């Protein structure tokens, strides 16, 4: 599914989002995809950029016009450029495995995205490896994989299954169980969270690698990396620094950081400055970025059992080998594409709901301020008009 990104002039390098064709200001133009709204610059410039785009759309809604038919015209008037298919060109959705699709659905706690079977899970099964246990040699040995996946991860599966029968978590999918049992670090982690998160983290980790992986990321993913880290080498340095400074057991992640549009007392919601960025984060023990509302794209396991048989205490060698020889950048790019689409759809819904609420409130206040006596009592007329608006 194609999607468009609207970027305020000056916000990003023109080379990153240069338009491939001139904008059409025809009112008949129809755009079926959702949009990311981001004005360039900061402070007043960012706010005014959004208002230039959203205000005409609000006017169209008042006149009963289609919002989608006005988007390109409003973008042109607001001095905003467009670019289609930033991430999804060259990626075949049909090649994504069912496990990856389920993984992304659970990453959002999206109950509706799973199958009926997923929605009524009463027993967690260990997922198979996406490749033979010796496929990552010589960088990760068969012995390490068999111990790591076959013993350590299996322990989490067995212990979690011993806890969920007859509990409040019975019937939940793995992702739902993990998110519902997270206690925000206020006390020791709930055992169900620890085991559910470790199972999820490990499945995500195994699918972050592939035989013959590593190298440079695909072009479109590289554009995001260059934008948010300055360069591929800059991203690698930050990832290595996070791994070297993670005290004890834990994980390092490359994430797509999203945040909901804040509710502000202004005419339009303003995205946060960190909206839609790639970030490196680290987490202790079993914590993962899902509990922060971020979309993980890449993970490396920093528990000692993940690397000690092959690298002993040379954690930095393990991390650099992971990045240079094992990472499946195609998988990372596919995850990024789906994370962007989810964020677009979510924030389009939040923004539309916010605007509609304000429009209804304004219409309601106008009706009450100027009741019209047509037939019957003015108060009855006002009440009838409010009901017609659904307020």
Swiss-Prot record:
Chief location of this protein within or outside the cell: plastid
Organism: Oryza sativa subsp. japonica
Family: Belongs to the iron/manganese superoxide dismutase family.
Required cofactor names: Fe cation
GO cellular component: chloroplast nucleoid
Cofactor note: Binds 1 Fe cation per subunit.
Subunit field text: Homodimer.
Gene3D superfamilies per the UniProt record, alphabetical: Fe,Mn superoxide dismutase (SOD) domain (1.10.287.990), Iron/manganese superoxide dismutase, C-terminal domain (3.55.40.20)
Chain spans, region Disordered: 87-120, 370-391
Compositionally skewed regions (Acidic residues) per UniProt: 87-119
Transit peptide: 1-73
Binding site for Fe cation: 148, 202, 301, 305
Pfam families: Sod_Fe_C (PF02777), Sod_Fe_N (PF00081)
Enzyme Commission number: 1.15.1.1
Lineage: superkingdom: Eukaryota
GO molecular function list: metal ion binding; superoxide dismutase activity
Polar residues bias (residue ranges): 381-391
Matching SUPFAM superfamilies: Fe,Mn superoxide dismutase (SOD), C-terminal domain, Fe,Mn superoxide dismutase (SOD), N-terminal domain
Subcellular location: Plastid, Chloroplast
Protein known as: Superoxide dismutase [Fe] 1, chloroplastic
Reactions the enzyme catalyzes: 2 superoxide + 2 H(+) = H2O2 + O2
């Amino acid at each position: 599914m194609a999607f468009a990104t609207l970027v305020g002039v000056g916000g990003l390098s023109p080379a990153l989002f240069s338009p491939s064709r001139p904008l059409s200001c025809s009112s008949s133009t129809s755009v079926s995809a959702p949009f990311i709204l981001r004005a360039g610059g900061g402070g007043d410039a960012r706010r005014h950029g959004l208002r230039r785009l959203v205000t005409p759309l609000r006017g169209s809604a008042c006149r009963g016009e289609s919002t989608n038919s006005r988007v390109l015209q409003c973008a042109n008037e607001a001095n905003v450029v467009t670019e289609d298919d930033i991430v999804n060109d060259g990626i075949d959705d049909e090649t994504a495995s069912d496990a990856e699709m389920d993984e992304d659905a659970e990453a959002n706690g999206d109950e509706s995205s799973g199958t009926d079977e997923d929605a009524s899970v009463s027993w967690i099964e260990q997922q198979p490896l996406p490749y033979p246990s010796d496929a990552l040699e010589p960088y990760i040995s068969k012995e390490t994989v068999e111990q790591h996946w076959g013993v350590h991860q299996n322990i989490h599966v067995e212990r979690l299954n011993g806890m969920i029968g007859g509990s409040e978590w019975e019937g939940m999918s793995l992702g739902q169980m993990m998110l519902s049992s997270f206690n925000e670090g206020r006390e020791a982690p709930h055992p169900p969270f620890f085991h559910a998160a470790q199972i999820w983290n490990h499945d995500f980790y195994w699918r972050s690698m592939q035989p013959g992986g590593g190298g440079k990321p695909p072009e479109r993913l590289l554009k995001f990396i260059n934008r948010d880290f300055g360069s591929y080498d800059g991203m690698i340095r930050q990832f290595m620094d996070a791994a070297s400074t993670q005290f004890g057991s834990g994980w390092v992640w490359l994430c797509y950081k999203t945040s909901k549009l804040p509710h502000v007392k202004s005419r339009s919601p303003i995205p946060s400055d960190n909206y839609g960025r790639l970030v490196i984060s680290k987490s202790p023990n079993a914590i993962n970025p899902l509990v922060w509302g971020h979309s993980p794209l890449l993970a490396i396991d920093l528990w000692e059992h993940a690397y000690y048989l092959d690298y002993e205490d040379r954690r930095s060698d393990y991390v650099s080998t992971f990045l240079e020889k094992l990472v499946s950048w195609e998988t990372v790019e596919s995850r990024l594409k789906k994370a962007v689409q989810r964020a677009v759809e979510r924030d389009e819904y939040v923004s539309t709901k916010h605007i509609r609420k304000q429009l209804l409130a304004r219409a309601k206040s106008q009706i009450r301020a100027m009741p019209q006596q047509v037939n019957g009592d003015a108060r009855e007329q006002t009440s009838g008009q409010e009901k017609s608006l659904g307020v």
